[in-house]
Amino acid sequence: MSTHFFGLTDRSFAYSHSVGRNEFSGTGFRNPVDMAVGDNDVMYVVNRGYEYRTDGVHITVVTLSEEYITEFGSYGAGPGQFVWPTAIALDGQGNVYLADEWLNRISVFNGEGEFLRSWPDGFEGGATQDDSSRMIAFGAGADIPAGKSGSGDGELDRPAGIAISKDGTIFVTDSRNHRVQKFTLDGKFLGKFGTFGSGLGELNMPWGISLDKEGNVFVADWRNDRIQQFTADGEWMASFGQSGDGVGQFNRPNGVCVDDDGDIYVADWLNNRVQVLAPDGRFVTALKGDHVLSQWGKDKLNSNPDMIRQRALAVSHNPNYERSFNHPCAVKIDGQGRLAVLDHFGGRIQVYAKSKDPVLV
């Protein structure tokens, strides 16, 4: 548990449990990079896999109660496939939007994983490729040409984050164009904001993006090591953080979300922690991981005596071997107000319950 008293309010975060383990398919994740929360606490987890194991590239659908539901998607450039999946979001109907920074496109699926369309390349659901036309690569992008990139309105160059507002506006962090673009649900360009730089309102390879309940936009300004806040129209509002490993400082933040209290959660990638900020950007606390082996992990461990011995040896040398975050990459708030932290190299989700009570100071 991590607790930090701040003003007249305390916020405490009690570790609940973990979901997942390192696995290429089924009840686990392999180099996960983002997740989205659906109804009934269903989680859609984007697996990036390895360059030498492209079967790890897919979306896993689970619940935070450790129920495995299904997985969908595969490696490739065809309709419904992806090479470097990076970010995921759901619209109000439960459709899934996936950003691919290699193919420079957004692919859309229904909640069951059926491909519907993609843009800006214009693939529609039902399109197929015969076996002779399929491109197979064993290194990311080795045999698959990168999707067309551009800097014009509606064109993408390494889309890295995606969020969808209540009115159906899609916000995409267009990383190498150093901007945020806005689209309709079917991919029509609506507007953009942000330019390259380190000044207020400027961006340098923005990554994660999230909206608060008022519709304000929070961007993980990755290379500037800060979080920036904008209105939905792109007007700059605030900037939080700077480079470093101290309180309120960041080292390549790549995920951000905001809860109903307005508290801001930042996946501080290279500092291996999640920082919690008050609505005005002041530091509240930092979470560094409290992992206890998930049920899926226990099931695998109990069936493999050699793995039991190897794990015991690793833990004896470093008691924090398992518990700590290992490059946290995404943070989300579920329907119960719990914080879910996606651990990239840990291949798991760590879940925390928040308490916020008045205290006497």
Where are these regions (language model features)?
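Eukaryotic scaffold repeat domains enriched in small/polar residues
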Residues: M1-V361
